[in-house]
């Protein structure tokens, strides 16, 4: 992990509970080793394919899909030397019980409504603070809380397969 990545993870971990952080990438290669942070990480792949590793499992997040990584989950991100463009959101979302999908890793399809809302939220800067932008903060928090129900269906998790040579 390079110094810039360590610094940003520190910013995430030190940010207040009522702050939503937003990071947009251009076309870039992703190679982030295993890490965890207290906020839920919601990654919208605008273009390209992202690989997410959680524990011993590896998943593909194709273009126009969302990776939902719960807070505290150890994960690795990579693009296997390919370039990817993403909008990444870090937000405090506490699961409401064992069966709440907010507490589990998931991949969701982004239909037009979801995609446009994510782009709108991402266009509002790098930080949304409840104290300074209460309406935008409440909209964003409500949107992310409803996202698992709004998605056309939780995708089958696209796992990497090991194919034998024989």
Region spans (language model):
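Generic protein-terminus/edge-of-domain signal
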Residues: 1-53, 59
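Short beta->alpha connector loops
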Residues: 50, 72-73
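Short acidic-glycine-tyrosine-enriched beta hairpin
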Residues: 56-71
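Generic detection of short hydrophobic beta-strand segments and adjacent strand-loop junctions
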Residues: 59-61, 106-109
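Ligand-binding loop in jelly-roll beta-barrel domains
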Residues: 73-105
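An amphipathic alpha-helical interaction segment
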Residues: 89, 109-166
